Amino acid sequence: MRFLIGALLTLQTLVQASSMSSMPNSYPVPEAPAEGGFRSVVYFVNWAIYGRGHNPQDLKADQFTHILYAFANIRPSGEVYLSDTWADTDKHYPGDKWDEPGKNVYGCTKQMYLLKKNNRNLKTLLSIGGWTYSPNFKTPASTEEGRKKFADTSLKLMKDLGFDGIDIDWEYPEDEKQANDFVLLLKACREALDAYSAKHPNGKKFLLTIASPAGPQNYNKLKLAEMDKYLDFWNLMAYDFSGSWDKVSGHMSNVFPSTTKPESTPFSSDKAVKDYIKAGVPANKIVLGMPLYGRAFASTDGIGTSFNGVGGGSWENGVWDYKDMPQQGAQVTELEDIAASYSYDKNKRYLISYDTVKIAGKKAEYITKNGMGGGMWWESSSDKTGNESLVGTVVNGLGGTGKLEQRENELSYPESVYDNLKNGMPS
């Protein structure tokens, strides 16, 4: 899930935001956070358990209000299905029994449920799509039958696996028809979730969120106000502003545009946030996405200059985990006026744009000052620990864990096909 918003940038005039048509307001109004009740959201990817050696048990769960478990895939019929059943439901972790009677679930989803049992303020959502699977949205979203299949099967996975909702990551609707289809897809999902909530013993509301674009060439195509009626909050992907697809090196997650080197900031978080609010999305429903990684530029003379290649990376070329930063021999530059930072090795002529602890603190200030809904991170395996943790820095900047949203999760799933989950994962 690397959100290449810059890859689609053209020299054409950006499409203006679509007009908002009226829709019935018969759906529950999403819960606004209490004063100071910030959301702390992180993506956990199911492939992290392999080379990265990162498992759900490694999460510092008390720092988060929501974990988005990524990713489920979509069939042309609209059926939502798990993308890696061994990681998702089959892998046995220490303490999992091989001779447990009945039909039982294991893997990462069991571990997510156990995290919820130990931290009743932690919610988990099944995230569907992502960059790789996003082309699979178009066909099922275009028909009522496909949308119903999507809503019904994502709801079933939520009930079977013990999630508190679903997160949709469609990158990105390409035209007005697909934008309309997205609204209708969210409507179908909201109706399915609310129908289940109405008959659920506890009657709790189940959540619906999306990963939303920060590039105007993408969000100007969306019907933001109409979508907002069905969403609990928006995870704004305010990163990947610059990368290998550009002609000059740039900041990949700056809050404000640079006035001294505008070519280094083709996008900014602040513009996206203001445009969303102008379109009708409440600030307290916008969760600011932040990267736990950096993007690299090789053979460059500095920020905003030409480059040639991206060099190596932690797991893919040109992308470095935050915990691998800064590299030996590189000098770190922090630009507080635009809330951006980077490292540069003048001998190797190698630049990496990433967030430092100081810049994470500036982003926490921005979230607070603008009354936003909290912070989100991609992805959980890449952070440092202790005082160097970007997540911890932002959470502390928002006032600490006591200022996070207080909303109890759901542990009762009487319709689950898995006996151990249906019984609350007895020890």
Swiss-Prot record:
Single GO MF descriptor: chitin binding
Pfam families hit by this protein: Glyco_hydro_18
SMART domains: Glyco_18
InterPro entries registered for this protein in UniProt: Chitinase_II/V-like_cat, Chitinase_insertion_sf, Glyco_hydro18_cat, Glyco_hydro_18_chit_AS, Glycoside_hydrolase_SF, Glycosyl_Hydrlase_18
Biological process according to GO: chitin catabolic process; polysaccharide catabolic process
Domain of life (superkingdom): Eukaryota
Residues the record marks as site: Transition state stabilizer: D169
Keywords: Carbohydrate metabolism, Chitin degradation, Chitin-binding, Glycoprotein, Glycosidase, Hydrolase, Polysaccharide degradation, Signal
Gene3D superfamilies associated with the record: 3.10.50.10, Glycosidases
Annotated EC: 3.2.1.14
GO cellular component: extracellular region
Alphabetized SUPFAM superfamilies for the sequence: (Trans)glycosidases, Chitinase insertion domain
PROSITE patterns (alphabetical): GH18_1 (PS01095), GH18_2 (PS51910)
Domain GH18: 38-401
Positions annotated as active site in the UniProt record: E171 (proton donor)
Reaction it catalyzes: Random endo-hydrolysis of N-acetyl-beta-D-glucosaminide (1->4)-beta-linkages in chitin and chitodextrins
Carbohydrate attachment residues: N387
Binding site for chitin: G102, K103, G129, G130, W131, T132, Y172, M237, A238, Y239, D240, W378
Signal peptide limits: 1-17
Family named by the database record: Belongs to the glycosyl hydrolase 18 family. Chitinase class V subfamily.
Protein name: Endochitinase 1
Organism: Coccidioides posadasii (strain C735)
Lineage of the organism: Eukaryota, Fungi, Dikarya, Ascomycota, Pezizomycotina
